């Protein structure tokens, strides 16, 4: 799977959430990852949110959209307590 993102947004995401988009992309390798639509953040394009464990062992929430040939990462952060529960309950 090919990933893309805006480099300025990626830098800002590290400052704000301490999560790189390179790490965020590894969430999609988690066989237990959960994905669904994110209608609250879909103004102008359909966005999705995926909860999964990264290659660094952190449970992350990754906001993304699908583009021809791949996935565009929009933001990434650690999950909230409620999101952790959703992931753990599968």
Kindly give the residue locations of the regions a language model identified.
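Ribonuclease/tRNase effector modules and their secretory precursors
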Residues: 1-90
């Amino acid at each position: 799977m090919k990933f893309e993102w805006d480099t300025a947004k990626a830098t800002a995401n590290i400052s704000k959430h301490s999560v790189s988009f390179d790490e965020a992309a590894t969430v999609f390798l988690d066989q237990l990852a959960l994905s669904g639509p994110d209608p609250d953040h879909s103004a102008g394009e359909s966005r999705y949110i995926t909860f999964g464990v990264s290659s660094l062992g952190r449970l992350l929430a990754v906001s993304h959209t699908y583009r021809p040939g791949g996935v565009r990462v929009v933001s990434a952060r650690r999950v909230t307590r409620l999101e952790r529960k959703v992931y753990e309950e599968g």
